């Protein structure tokens, strides 16, 4: 498994823990630093991804909801939602990562961690987000 895939999977675990436990982000990151053995570059990429998602969570969640026909965030499976948050962060705020790579990585992670409907659900919403004509959703700020 590649460094970035491993980092995205670690980031998913961090986001899920943050979403479920609702403690401070600092405590969540510290818990993973102390409790999960991984390479430094993997951990750094995962933490940067988590911090980016948390920093832009409101905009990311709004973008997901806008493309989720008849789905409120509260009804979405937590794993699927956090996979989409990671990919949406990359699609909206990271110009150095090709959009198709972000979507494909999210689908593969959904296959591994979600249920049998997860890959199609994640793909459908991310395809809508990727196809959005509003270029201002993809920021150069990071």
Swiss-Prot record:
Gene3D superfamilies (alphabetical): NusB-like
SUPFAM superfamilies: NusB-like
Source taxon at top rank: Bacteria
Keyword field contains Transport: no
Keywords: RNA-binding, Transcription, Transcription antitermination, Transcription regulation
Database matches in CDD domains: Terminator_NusB (cd00619)
GO cellular component, one term: cytosol
Keyword Lipid biosynthesis: no
Recorded GO MF terms: RNA binding
GO BP field: DNA-templated transcription termination; transcription antitermination
Pfam family, one: NusB
Coiled-coil ranges (or none): none
Cross-referenced PANTHER family: ANTITERMINATION NUSB DOMAIN-CONTAINING PROTEIN, N UTILIZATION SUBSTANCE PROTEIN B-RELATED
UniProt record similarity statement: Belongs to the NusB family.
Described purpose of this protein according to its UniProt entry: Involved in transcription antitermination. Required for transcription of ribosomal RNA (rRNA) genes. Binds specifically to the boxA antiterminator sequence of the ribosomal RNA (rrn) operons.
The protein's name in its UniProt record: Transcription antitermination protein NusB
Organism field: Trichlorobacter lovleyi (strain ATCC BAA-1151 / DSM 17278 / SZ) (Geobacter lovleyi)
Organism ancestry: Bacteria, Pseudomonadati, Thermodesulfobacteriota, Desulfuromonadia, Geobacterales
């Amino acid at each position: 498994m590649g460094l970035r895939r491993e980092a995205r999977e670690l980031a998913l675990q961090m986001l899920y823990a943050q979403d479920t436990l609702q403690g401070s982000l600092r405590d969540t990151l510290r818990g993973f630093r102390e409790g999960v053995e991984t390479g430094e570059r993997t951990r750094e990429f995962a933490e940067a991804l988590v911090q980016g998602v948390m920093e832009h969570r409101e905009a990311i969640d709004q973008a997901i909801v806008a493309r989720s026909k008849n789905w409120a965030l509260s009804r979405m499976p937590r794993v699927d939602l956090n996979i989409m948050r990671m990919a949406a962060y990359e699609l909206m705020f990271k110009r150095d990562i090709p959009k198709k790579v972000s979507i494909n990585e999210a689908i593969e992670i959904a296959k591994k961690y979600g249920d049998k409907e997860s890959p199609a659900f994640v793909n459908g919403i991310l395809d809508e987000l990727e196809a959005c004509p509003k270029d201002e959703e993809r920021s150069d700020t990071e």
